[in-house]
Every structure is written in structure tokens, then in C-alpha cells.
């Protein structure tokens, strides 16, 4: 937003500010930047008593200068705004909603390629010779060490080099003294993680006829130059790479022509593409009656002048994606953009191919596994209006579409839509805010909607649309529960029941494919000494180590610690046995049973390189690999017509977790994975192996009876006062000293009493639980305790919690502690 008058001051959100001191800081705008500076740009500014350089985001500009001395903006980092006015409003809203700083919220919206790294360096001041600095540092060994390093390094060194000086723990105080004494100067450079990609382009500088006349006499002596000129006469301009390829000329020839003035060379921005170029655009398929009814109702909402929200509840394979495609087509016809989010990166390639087939180059992809350069370029394509359909995971909700008409959350119940990084946002809440800003439609899609979403539809907060049958009248798979207790009594102690083994062999005989689901990676859950019962545990975390047969090591899945598997127990010299099966062990068992059959494994250990999930799924599809084994990556969104059997190896795994959402998560996961079978013309079967075959949740999942499950779960939540009836705020404090963490938790708990006690009566009265240890007390040498607040999520409680968080961060007794607040955490 350009001002009529030149800007004199700017309100800036700072990267260096913690939540406790986060507010807009006022800085003077230097004359050199007065015409360039725009809200949404980033700057370098001095901050604090030591005037340390900090990145900042310009929030607003003013042409008035308040009284008092102001610090001045140092460097402009961006040639154009990285956030729009909507983005700035969103960052301010996220600060209030998710207890983060404005700058952290802004950074969350940007691709990492746009992030800056500040490099601080120091140099010997001009005019300071060796004799001078040796004399002035004679009484300070630390200062003498630093000056000696700078001298040996040619007069300049960065902060990391200075910190590496032996026995010099914290050099900052000494550096400030040297700077104050005029012996050194400080410089800060801001370097971006990735730059814009360009390539040299050649264009004629004269009329084609004139160029050919100039080069004609040299056709024999300089044939390559003549060919290049001839090609440019036809094309007008071309990349240097293309000119060299089609004419056989070298870059030296092209530079020579540029020197002669025949052509000019300039750099043109090009995009690193995250996807292959598309062929012909495929027309949309015809919707069946129930899809058409849902589509028409949703289209009416999308064309409303006010923001709308809807839930599309459809059984697995009912064709929700086709409804999405038709709605996106209508949004594009209206000149508006659309965002489609999926919970797993593994789901992106298959969905992307569908969208590319229908919308071609209008599609952009945004997720964290893209190479930094590709992700940055895709973001630019969206920002510049070259792509209007964005497909991606959670972070795609921030795609800078200028006119956003539709946001779709597919599999909206998934916990991966909630961030566990520095800003603890939920993509659904951000999507609501953005749809409100753009007056667009938020569409939540699922075969097993979150209890909160289904309740919102039931109470009129969302519009509800249903798809009760599979597309093309395909039947839902037939599901059977296999009792593993009976298997054990019959002498079968393997990971596969007799029933599942029989069905697998039947599929192999028919040439049909099978998916096996086991939500535990590694070989075995733990190693156990058969004599003394010793279990190797992680020295940094309060968890046992998981055995990985691929490298023969015991590994911690929380901090990354690993150790070789001991040959014997270090306590009693007994032998280790392995308890609990993981995907590696199941793969070994399957390969022993069927040595001539390929078993493909898909988990966090096999999905390591960029796009490795795409490669695996493409091989499974094209090569017709008989068995795909994996963790929850294989449970959702995969659509392979030749998959007719799904086996759930351990249906109880998530059912008894220490989490009020355990039943919901188990039901959803089982329903989703079972739904991978029978999506083509052949009927599907599914087998759920369990130790508790009478469990209601497992039986409802086997029947895919979501409505009965929802009714019971809703009543349980009402009685226990869990979401959607009350909200949860979870305050987690972690640190290296357990007593310090407990003390901080106790202070936070007491700080809530003045607000809680007058309000705690009645069905919606607030309640505080804790302090209590987290389910895993210690992770990476940091103890974790929690305080849980049950109440309505309104401005009053958010303001009180923000005040408590500021006080806790400013309490010197809490030095070294991390204090986080999660709103309605998905992990309970």
C-alpha cells in the first residue's frame, strides 16, 4: 500500500522478540527507503541495549514522527512485499490465537527458501595496527585472543570462528568492549537460503534483415555465428542453452556476437518445476446422482456473498474427489483460486496426477519434502497468479492466492493438520480465517469426520452433505476380525493369522494386490533379556529403544540416539529376545514365507530421499508389486483398482493409548485402511487382527458404521467435558532440571486460580488438571510436565493465558525452560 506522503516511521514485528515482549516496535524510516518501503517487507533493524541486528516485518507506515528518539531501520531485505495485507492480518490473528510472536507466524507462512540467515562478523577497525591493539588488550586475555584471531584471519572473522576459540565460552561481552573501545567494527549480512533461478537469454539488437546482411559475408569464416543469427531472426529471442543445442555453437560464439552488438544477453527468471509438464487436459467425469446433489448444494454455498463452511461426509470410495474437481472448476471459471490439502505427503502424488490431468499448469504443489528451490518457485507461481490451484499438505493453507474462493481439507480428521513446530496452529482454523477474509467456502471432507466437525454440522455451524454409496455402485469390502488369542492357543506365534495367510495366498494365486498395515516401524518394539528382564532404554528419553534389523542397532524414535545391539545382556550376560513386531520384522517374515514374491515396505525408514514415496507408489502401481506393507502412509487416500485385500496386522495398537481421542483415531484409521480394498471392479476383503475381538470400536470399524460410533463417542465426550463441549488448553513446560520444571508448572497452576474459582460451577465451568508428567516424561534430556485447562475458547481466557505465558517467560527462575500452549491438541 503506497502512501501519498513519504513514510517517516514504521511499525515493525521483530524476530528477536520473545512472546513476552512481542509488540509492534516503532522505527524511523531513513530518507533512502522512504519511497521503497511497503508493509509486508522485511528489514534489518537494531534492537535492544546492544543494538543487535534483528530481522523485522514492516506492519504499517506513518508520516508522523512521535516525540522521543527513535532507532532507524538499517537494511531493506526484500525488493517486494513477502506478505500481503491479508497475510499481515493473519499473522496478527495467529499471535492472539496460538500464543506465538507475529514474526514467527509470518515466517511460518513463507517457504524456507525465503528465510534469511544472519551472519555476524567482526573486523579490525580502520587505522588500528597491531601495536595499538596489543597495547590496549594487554590486561584482557580474552580480548587479546579475539584480536589475535582477527589479525591471523586477515583482519576479519565471523562470530562462529570467534566462538571456536578454546576456553572462550561467551565472547559477546568482550566483543562489545572491543567495539566500544574502537578496536573492531561489527557487520551483519543477511543471506537467503535460496535465490531466484535465472538463465541467460539472447535477443537481436537490430532488424533481422540488417543482422543477416551484417553476417552474410562471414557465413563461411564464421558459420556458427551465422546459424545463431539466422535462428534468432526466426525466433526473436531464445535461451543461450537452446541456441547452443539447436545450432551446435559454443557459448564463446554467442558472447562474441554480443560484443559485436548483434545480440544482447540478459538474465530471465525461470521456475524450477516440482512436477512434470502435462499433456492434454482431461474433461471432468460425469457425477452420479448423490454426487450431483452434494455438488449442487456446495456450489450454491460457494456462490453466496458471505463465507461458508461445509462438511462432505462420504464413505471410502464414494467419489469425494470428483466433487472437489467440479467445485474447483467452477471456482476457476469465476476467476478465483482453490487450495486442496491432504494429511500425508505420500497422498500428494496420486492426487496431484488427477488435478494435473484436469487443470494442467494452473496447479502448484506445496509441501515440506520438495527441494527448497522448487518449493520457493511454486510459491512464486501462486503469488504471481500463474497457478490458481494449490495441492499440498498442512502448510499449503498459507498459499498466497490473491483471490481465494475455496479451501478443501481432505481427510479433515487427521492429526497431521495440527502443527507441532514453533507455531502450534491447526490448518482448519487458519482455513476458516482465510475463507472469512475472502468470503470463500471451506469444505471439510472425510469418511470418518472428527467428532468436533460432525457435531458442528449437527448443530448448524457447518452445512452437511453425505455420500452414502461407493462410486459406480462398488460394494464396501467385507471385513472379518481375526482373534489372535485363538491363533496363539493353536500354536501360531507369528505376526500373521491363518486366515490372513490364506487370503494372501489366494490373492497371489489370482494376481491381485494386497496392502498390509502395521503402524509400528522398525523390527521389534523392544529388546528384552530373557533372564533378568532388562530392557535397553534411551539415555536421553524415558522410552525403550526399538530394534532395527536393517542396521542391527537399537534406536530411539524421539531423539535419534542409537547403539549397537549387545551380543549379551550387560547386566547378567543373558540373551536378548525381541518383543512386539514392527514393519521390518513383518517384511522378513513375509519374505521367508514367500521367497519368490516382492514385498514392498513403506515407512519413515524407506521414505528418506525427496520423492521416494512417489517412486515406491509408482512402482507398486506399474509393476503390480504383490504386497505393499507400511505404516499409516498406506492407510489413506491410495486408490489402486487391483488391491482387493487389506490386512491390519495389529488392530489394537492405537486403541489403548493414553489419549481421549484414542477410540476416534483407531476407528478412523481402521475404516480408512479397510477402504483401500475393492476400489475397482473386483470385490474387496479386509482382515483386522486383534487380541480383543469383542471390542465395540473394532466391531464398528469392521462394519464401517460411523454414525453409531459418533453417537457413542459424542455422549462420552459430553460426560467427560471434552471437545466439542469444552475446549482444551494444554500448557507444557520442559527443561533439563525436573524440579525447576515442576516449580514453574506449580506457579502457572496457581496463577489460574483467581480466574477459575469464580467460574467453576455449572456445566461449562472451567476446570484445571495438573501439573502432571507428560506421557513420555523426558525427551532429549528435557523433562516435560503439563497443566490442562478445560474451558470455552474465548478472548478472555486467551488473554489470561497470554498474560501467564508472558510472566513465566520473564521469570528469571525459568531460565532455560520452554513454555508452550497448545489449543485443542490432537494428541490429547
Which positions does each model-derived feature cover?
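Accessory, non-ATPase domains that flank or precede helicase/AAA+ motor cores in DNA-metabolism machines
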Residues: 1-446, 458-474, 788, 795-828
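Short secondary-structure junctions
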Residues: 18, 594-597, 752-767, 811-816
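Active-site phosphate-binding and catalytic loops of NTP-dependent enzymes
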Residues: 99-108, 185-189, 303, 515, ...
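A general structural signal for alpha-helical elements within enzymatic catalytic domains
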Residues: 151, 167, 356, 505, ...
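Inter-lobe coupling/hinge segments of SF2-like helicase ATPases
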Residues: 278-288, 292-293, 299, 305-732, ...
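Extracytoplasmic/periplasmic
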Residues: 739-754
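A carboxyl-terminal module marker
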Residues: 754-755, 763-783, 805, 819-827
Amino acid at each position: 500500500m503506497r502512501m501519498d506522503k513519504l513514510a517517516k516511521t514504521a511499525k515493525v514485528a521483530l524476530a528477536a522478540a520473545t512472546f513476552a515482549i512481542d509488540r509492534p516496535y516503532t522505527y524511523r524510516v531513513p530518507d533512502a527507503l522512504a519511497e521503497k518501503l511497503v508493509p509486508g517487507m522485511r528489514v534489518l533493524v537494531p534492537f535492544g541495549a546492544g543494538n543487535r541486528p534483528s530481522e523485522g516485518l514492516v506492519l504499517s507506515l506513518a508520516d508522523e514522527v512521535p516525540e522521543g528518539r527513535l532507532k532507524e531501520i538499517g537494511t531493506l531485505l526484500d525488493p517486494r512485499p513477502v506478505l500481503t495485507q491479508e497475510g499481515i492480518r493473519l499473522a496478527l490473528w495467529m499471535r492472539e490465537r496460538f500464543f506465538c510472536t507475529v514474526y514467527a507466524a509470518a515466517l511460518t507462512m513463507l517457504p524456507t527458501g525465503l528465510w534469511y540467515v544472519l551472519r555476524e562478523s567482526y573486523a579490525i577497525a580502520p587505522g588500528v595496527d597491531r601495536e595499538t591493539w596489543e597495547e590496549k588488550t594487554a590486561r584482557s586475555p580474552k580480548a587479546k585472543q579475539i584480536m589475535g584471531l582477527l589479525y591471523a584471519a586477515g583482519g576479519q572473522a565471523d562470530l562462529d570462528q570467534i566462538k571456536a576459540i578454546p576456553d572462550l565460552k561467551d565472547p559477546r561481552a568482550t566483543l562489545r568492549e572491543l567495539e566500544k573501545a574502537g578496536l573492531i567494527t561489527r557487520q551483519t549480512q543477511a543471506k537467503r537460503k535460496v535465490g531466484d533461478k535465472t538463465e541467460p537469454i539472447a535477443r537481436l539488437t537490430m532488424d533481422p534483415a540488417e543482422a543477416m546482411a551484417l553476417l552474410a559475408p562471414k557465413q563461411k569464416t564464421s558459420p556458427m555465428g551465422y546459424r545463431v543469427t539466422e535462428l534468432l531472426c526466426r525466433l526473436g529471442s531464445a535461451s543461450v542453452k537452446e541456441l547452443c543445442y539447436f545450432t551446435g555453437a559454443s557459448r564463446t560464439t554467442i558472447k562474441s556476437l554480443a560484443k559485436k552488438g548483434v545480440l544482447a544477453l540478459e538474465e530471465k527468471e525461470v521456475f524450477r518445476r516440482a512436477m512434470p509438464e502435462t499433456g492434454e487436459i482431461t474433461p471432468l467425469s460425469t457425477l452420479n446422482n448423490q454426487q450431483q446433489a452434494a455438488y449442487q448444494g456446495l456450489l450454491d454455498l460457494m456462490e453466496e456473498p458471505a463465507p461458508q463452511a461445509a462438511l462432505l461426509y462420504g464413505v471410502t470410495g464414494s467419489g469425494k474427489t470428483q466433487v472437489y474437481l467440479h467445485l474447483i472448476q467452477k471456482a476457476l471459471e469465476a476467476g478465483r483460486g482453490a487450495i486442496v490439502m491432504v494429511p500425508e505427503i505420500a497422498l500428494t502424488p496420486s492426487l496431484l496426477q488427477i488435478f494435473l490431468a484436469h487443470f494442467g499448469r494452473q496447479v502448484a504443489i506445496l509441501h515440506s519434502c520438495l527441494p527448497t528451490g522448487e518449493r520457493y518457485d511454486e510459491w512464486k507461481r501462486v503469488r504471481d497468479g500463474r497457478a490458481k490451484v494449490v495441492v499440498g499438505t498442512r502448510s499449503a493453507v498459507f498459499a498466497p492466492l490473491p483471490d481465494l474462493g475455496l479451501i478443501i481439507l481432505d481427510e479433515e480428521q487427521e492429526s497431521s493438520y495440527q502443527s507441532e513446530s514453533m507455531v502450534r496452529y491447526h490448518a482448519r482454523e487458519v482455513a476458516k480465517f482465510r475463507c472469512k477474509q475472502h468470503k470463500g467456502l471451506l469444505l471439510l471432507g472425510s469418511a470418518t469426520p472428527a467428532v468436533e466437525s460432525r457435531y458442528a454440522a449437527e448443530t448448524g455451524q457447518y452445512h452437511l452433505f453425505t455420500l452414502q454409496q461407493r462410486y459406480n455402485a462398488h460394494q464396501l469390502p467385507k471385513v472379518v476380525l481375526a482373534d489372535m488369542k485363538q491363533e496363539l492357543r493353536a500354536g501360531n506365534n507369528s505376526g500373521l493369522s491363518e486366515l490372513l495367510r490364506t487370503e494372501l495366498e489366494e490373492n497371489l494365486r489370482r494376481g491381485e494386490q494386497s496392502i498390509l498395515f502395521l503402524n509400528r516401524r522398525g523390527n521389534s518394539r523392544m529388546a528384552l533379556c530373557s533372564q533378568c528382564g532388562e530392557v535397553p532404554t534411551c539415555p536421553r528419553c524415558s522410552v525403550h529403544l526399538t530394534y532395527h534389523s536393517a542396521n542391527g542397532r537399537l534406536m530411539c524414535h524421539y531423539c535419534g540416539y542409537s547403539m549397537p545391539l549387545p551380543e549379551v545382556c550387560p547386566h547378567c550376560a543373558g540373551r536378548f529376545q525381541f518383543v512386539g513386531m514392527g514393519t521390518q520384522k513383518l517384511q522378513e517374515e513375509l519374505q521367508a514365507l514367500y521367497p519368490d514374491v516382492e514385498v514392498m515396505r513403506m515407512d519413515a525408514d524407506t521414505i528418506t530421499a525427496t520423492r521416494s514415496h512417489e517412486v515406491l507408489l509408482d512402482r507398486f502401481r506399474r509393476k503390480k508389486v504383490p504386497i505393499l506393507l507400511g505404516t499409516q502412509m498406506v492407510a489413506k487416500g491410495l486408490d489402486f483398482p487391483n488391491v482387493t485385500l487389506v490386512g491390519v496386522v495389529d488392530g489394537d495398537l492405537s486403541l489403548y493409548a493414553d489419549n481421549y481421542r484414542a477410540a476416534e483415531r483407531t476407528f478412523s484409521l481402521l475404516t480408512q485402511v479397510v477402504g483401500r480394498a475393492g476400489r475397482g471392479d473386483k470385490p474387496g476383503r479386509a482382515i483386522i487382527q486383534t487380541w480383543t475381538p469383542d471390542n465395540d470400536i473394532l466391531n464398528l470399524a469392521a462394519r464401517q458404521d460411523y454414525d453409531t460410533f459418533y453417537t457413542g463417542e459424542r455422549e462420552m465426550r459430553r460426560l467427560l467435558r471434552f471437545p466439542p463441549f469444552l475446549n482444551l488448553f494444554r500448557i507444557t513446560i520442559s527443561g533439563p532440571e525436573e524440579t525447576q520444571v515442576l516449580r514453574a508448572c506449580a506457579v502457572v497452576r496457581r496463577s489460574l486460580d483467581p480466574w477459575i474459582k469464580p467460574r467453576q460451577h455449572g456445566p461449562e465451568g472451567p476446570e484445571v488438571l495438573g501439573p502432571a508428567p507428560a506421557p513420555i516424561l523426558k525427551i532429549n534430556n528435557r523433562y516435560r510436565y503439563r497443566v490442562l485447562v478445560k474451558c470455552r475458547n474465548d478472548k478472555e481466557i486467551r488473554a489470561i493465558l497470554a498474560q501467564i505465558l508472558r510472566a513465566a517467560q520473564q521469570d528469571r527462575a525459568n531460565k532455560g525452560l520452554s513454555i508452550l500452549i497448545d489449543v485443542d491438541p490432537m494428541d490429547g
